[in-house]
Amino acid sequence: MRDDVAFSLRRFKLPKHERLARVDAALERFGLADFAERSPHTLSGGQKQLLALAAVMVIDPILIIADEPTTLLDLRNRDRIKREFARLEQQLLVVTHDLDFLRDFDRVICIDNHRIAADGRPAEVIDFYQDLMAQRPL
């Protein structure tokens, strides 16, 4: 698993000790340090999701796009991701149907039928989305 995270750093020409330190820090950050030597194929779905996030975060991107980042995560790890996202300095774009996850965001946008249907504070947009979905037949 350590190699998978390190692969993200291949284009940065970092000294080996710095590359390893960054990889270990990313694994620790996402609660994966104890699994560093395991093959990703042996991980649970939630652990694979955390590994994917670690592989992105290790490069310290200026923009992070996360598509359903809480999928397959238990509540403990979902909260870990929420805390990690809250402390980011980077711009963060999250695509999710996990409405509770969005409650502390600065801004939420609801897309419906390929257009922006609502844009604003989380509580307002979440209420809008729930009302919109309640009006739709199953």
Give, region by region, the residue ranges found by the protein language model.
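Conserved beta-strand-loop-alpha-helix hinge in the C-terminal portion
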Residues: 115-137
